[in-house]
């Protein structure tokens, strides 16, 4: 077998592989010799079929098997012998001419194919001893815990029907039909909808007009959808809602006690506070971790500068760009609405994709040298977390992970990355710094920079509680950002 390098340009490689027809024929004859005693052909005793006849009957199929085996096995062997790792699966090209293919299968012509791929760049690891990061630490006060417990209690509070007029804080149960230009619009109708006046869950002006209504009353409410409303067919338009009030209920007293805890399925009020404190600690811990990780990645990004495989960058960029456009479409916005242009956005995301690929390669090399591995238990837990997001589809999801190596890799990658970060935290200089809640939540200069690369958040449309599917109201005004938070985040190298 001849292996000839025909292209070595940057990270691109092209290898021509030639297996002489004589070698292919010899391998075919070996296969025929191995199976001749097992083959049954009418008119011949077992093991007595002439070799020429066997070759005539089975030669092409055996040669086809040999070709498939070579194409399947040799690329990895060739890369290994060259001491190279390909960035993606090598592309394999061979003749598509039927006459040439027939000559190869009959050992009249050498079998040739070409491998095209990009190599992973060699990375010479540098010492991380000079990396210095600050870990922000926050003390959680009893007041903050009590404040959150109170919110939990308010969400679980009971309401009691009343005969008087509705006031701020009362819960209204109602049917309504929304209309624009006297025509009911999709998603603007509901029955038995519940709304706490003053909760801000409906579009501006809607809830205020419910103050003073009574059970059994019918009322027409007039509102104007915000100009930046996600549903463009409703944005800026005046709408009316014909409301029938079914019930007005006053909120019960909020008491944090064992009875409340029991209602929530918790043994005691003290245990409820412990759980809430743990949740707050987890939330702050995640934010601290995110800031810490950003500092590490930023410094690694400064330390390593090398060419990245275009195939990996393109794949990363395409993923980011797809999510950017999906998020913009769902928010009903354009690049101009986000104070940028498509051309500028593409440049930013291309740079971001290159950074993420470069950091991913660096972290991979660091992890490999440090012996970082993702255990089977860690994979199982991560897959279980995925299954919980799709109740009733567990069997299909499991089969998907079993049959698609790429799916398992997408689960493994973030786990591996976090374990490498854990390893780095044992090697670098970490200084703890006590901060306030406001300081922890504040963006530093680096975060503010990255924030400009995140897309407008998805905006729930609601003229009814929790958002009407067709987008007839809003829960919160979106912040102006230019890229999706998850995919465009610089806090990850995945």
Curated annotation (Swiss-Prot):
Please give the biological process terms from Gene Ontology that the record holds.
'de novo' cotranslational protein folding; cell division; chaperone-mediated protein folding; protein transport; protein unfolding
Q: What is its EC number?
A: 5.2.1.8
Keyword line: Cell cycle, Cell division, Chaperone, Cytoplasm, Isomerase, Rotamase
The record, for InterPro entries, names: PPIase_dom_sf, PPIase_FKBP_dom, Trig_fac, Trigger_fac_C, Trigger_fac_C_sf, Trigger_fac_ribosome-bd_bac, Trigger_fac_ribosome-bd_sf, Trigger_fact/SurA_dom_sf
What GO molecular function annotation could you give as one example from this UniProt entry? peptidyl-prolyl cis-trans isomerase activity
Provide the residue span(s) of the region labelled Disordered.
440-494
Lineage: superkingdom: Bacteria
Q: Which SUPFAM superfamilies match?
A: FKBP-like, Triger factor/SurA peptide-binding domain-like, Trigger factor ribosome-binding domain
The yes or no answer to whether the keyword Isomerase is present is yes
Q: Which GO terms describe its cellular component?
A: cytoplasm
- Tell me which stretches of the chain form a coiled coil: none
Sorted alphabetically, which Pfam families does this protein's record hold?
FKBP_C (PF00254), Trigger_C (PF05698), Trigger_N (PF05697)
PPIase FKBP-type domain location = 169-254
Catalyzed reaction equations: [protein]-peptidylproline (omega=180) = [protein]-peptidylproline (omega=0)
Q: What is its main location?
A: cytoplasm
User: What subcellular locations does the record give?
Assistant: Cytoplasm
Q: Main role? A: Involved in protein export. Acts as a chaperone by maintaining the newly synthesized protein in an open conformation. Functions as a peptidyl-prolyl cis-trans isomerase.
Give the family per the record.
Belongs to the FKBP-type PPIase family. Tig subfamily.
Domain notes for this protein:
Consists of 3 domains; the N-terminus binds the ribosome, the middle domain has PPIase activity, while the C-terminus has intrinsic chaperone activity on its own.
The protein's name = Trigger factor
Q: Which organism is it from?
A: Rhizobium etli (strain ATCC 51251 / DSM 11541 / JCM 21823 / NBRC 15573 / CFN 42)
């Amino acid at each position: 077998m001849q292996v000839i390098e025909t292209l070595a340009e940057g990270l691109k490689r092209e290898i021509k592989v030639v297996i002489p027809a004589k070698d292919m024929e010899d391998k075919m004859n070996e296969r025929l010799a191995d199976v001749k005693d097992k083959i049954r052909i009418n008119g011949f005793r077992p093991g007595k079929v002439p070799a020429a006849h066997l070759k005539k009957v089975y030669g092409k199929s055996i040669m086809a098997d040999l070709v498939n085996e070579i194409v399947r096995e040799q690329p990895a062997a060739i890369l290994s012998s060259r001491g190279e790792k390909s960035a993606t699966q090598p592309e394999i090209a061979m003749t598509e001419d039927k006459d040439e293919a027939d000559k190869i299968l009959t050992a009249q012509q050498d079998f040739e194919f070409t491998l095209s791929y990009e190599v992973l760049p060699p990375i010479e690891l540098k010492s991380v001893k000079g990396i210095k990061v600050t870990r922000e630490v926050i003390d959680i006060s009893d007041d903050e815990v009590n404040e959150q417990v109170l919110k939990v209690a308010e969400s679980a509070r009971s309401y009691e029907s009343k005969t008087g007029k509705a006031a701020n804080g009362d819960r209204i149960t109602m049917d309504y039909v929304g209309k624009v230009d006297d025509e009911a619009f999709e998603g603007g109708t509901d029955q038995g909808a519940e709304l706490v006046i003053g909760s801000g869950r409906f579009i501006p002006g809607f809830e205020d007009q419910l103050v003073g209504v009574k059970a059994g009353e019918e009322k027409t409410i007039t509102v104007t959808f915000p100009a930046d409303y996600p549903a463009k067919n409703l944005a800026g338009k005046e709408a009316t809602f014909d409301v029938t009030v079914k019930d007005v209920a006053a909120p019960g007293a909020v008491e944090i006690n064992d009875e409340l805890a029991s209602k929530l399925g918790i043994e005691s009020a003290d245990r409820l506070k412990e759980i809430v404190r743990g949740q707050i600690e987890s939330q702050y811990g995640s934010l601290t971790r995110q800031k810490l990780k950003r500092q590490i990645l930023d410094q690694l990004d400064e330390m390593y500068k090398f060419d990245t495989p275009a195939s990996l960058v393109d794949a990363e960029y395409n993923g980011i760009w797809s999510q950017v456009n999906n998020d913009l479409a769902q928010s009903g916005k354009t690049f101009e609405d986000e104070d940028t242009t498509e051309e500028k956005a593409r440049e930013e995301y291309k740079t971001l994709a290159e950074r993420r690929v470069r950091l991913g390669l660096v972290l991979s090399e660091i992890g490999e040298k440090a012996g970082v591995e993702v255990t089977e238990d860690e994979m199982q837990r991560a897959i279980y977390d995925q299954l919980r997001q799709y109740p009733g589809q567990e069997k299909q999801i499991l089969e998907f992970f079993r049959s698609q190596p790429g799916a398992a890799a997408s689960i493994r990658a973030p786990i591996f990355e976090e374990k490498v970060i854990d390893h780095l935290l044992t090697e670098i200089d970490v200084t703890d710094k006590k901060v306030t809640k406001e300081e922890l939540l504040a963006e530093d200069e680096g975060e503010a920079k990255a924030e400009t690369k995140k897309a407008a958040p998805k905006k729930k449309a609601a003229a009814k509680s929790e958002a009407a599917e067709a987008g007839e109201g809003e829960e919160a005004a979106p912040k102006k950002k230019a890229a999706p938070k998850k995919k465009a985040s610089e806090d990850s190298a995945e």
